[in-house]
Amino acid sequence: MAEMELATLICGEIAGTLRQDEHGLCSFAYAPTYRGAPLSLTMPLSNRTYGHNIVRPFLFGLLPDSQEQRRAIAAEYDVASNNPVALLCHIGLDCAGAVQFCRADQLDAARGRVSAYRPLTNSQIAHKLKAIRDDERETWMGSNESWSLGGNQGKFALAWHDGQWCECLGSSPTTHIFKNGVVGFKHQALNEFVCMKTARRVGIPTANVSYCTFEDEAALVVERYDRMVNSSGNIERLHQEDFCQALGVLPSQKYTADGGPTTRDIQERLINTVPHHMNLVLFTYMLFYNAIIGAPDAHAKNYSIILGKGTNAALAPMYDVASGLAYERMRRRARLAMSVGGENRVGRIGPGAIRRYHGMGDPALETALTDAGLSEKFCFATMMDLAYEVPICMEEVINEYADLPGMADLREHMLGPVCESCQRALDLIRADKG
């Protein structure tokens, strides 16, 4: 295997060097002068060289989970689909967060000195949406695009630039993600739109979403929270990572049932961040919200953290949230990707599970959580608040967007089951209180 060396930039600054040796093993070392945000919480700033087992999970987290998608990209560039360094050499100019990878001769491009936007018509966007529905491998990216998105769902990224949608060429940062839902689940993109809007209405920070139609193709359009427009009108990147990356776990193990991260793993990671109180509170709200609406895909890759210098970090807004209760087959055996206090059955999250979530039977963890403001009383109050508010807020969202195609059908199949789930949570807590 060919040796390879890629410059690694974070927020446009050279942060270090990613290397691959002749055996295919990768490593990363920070530049001696770099003082910015760490590449990952698993790789704090240091003069050491981080080895293959630490670096590899982070790199794979930047790539699509789907092996078919990775194979399609690999075939385009004639590299191996299981070689993240080789893939990022070609599509690493616009990754999740603020990290960029490039060869030394691409540094000008990576720093934005060689970039451009290509405007798209509604018809062209409709064609891209239709293509990922028919065969998501075909439209992972267009020619001359250099972005990469993690995850398993068909999607593509564009930029809103000068009042129009554009493809990004060179290192131009994308600003929005387009997806038309998980194949096989009716109105799934609309489902996600409603669940995201509901979460925001109950007070949980979420990525901005809109539901748009391009000719006859509907899409959920998600504004990237890891992008911001500065005072000069330029788009800046914010560095972030998901919790598989933050815990050094490969995306293939993102589900707890597959040996992936647990709520306790995330709690323990957040305790060591600043401000840990706010991060733990928000994570609890997000976890309980996913549980109460029966979201089956709220695994560790669907929680992320925005990184600052040192241990400064802020839990990222919610994203990729949709209820499984809208679908009869999932209602019958609904399971959560990440349990609450060891309980992953939707509708069974009762007082015992909530108490176990507060410490998981570990006195040291329980004390740390309580000291951080995450008391058992707070956990019960959070679940009850959500159980009261979610049915009201979800119905308000559905009514506000009643004219969207498919909304009446979604109301019929989702609102009732979600309300029932909320009522069961309240009943279990009330029964415990006597």
Whereabouts are the PLM-identified features?
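Anionic ligand-binding catalytic core segments
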Residues: 1-300, 304-434
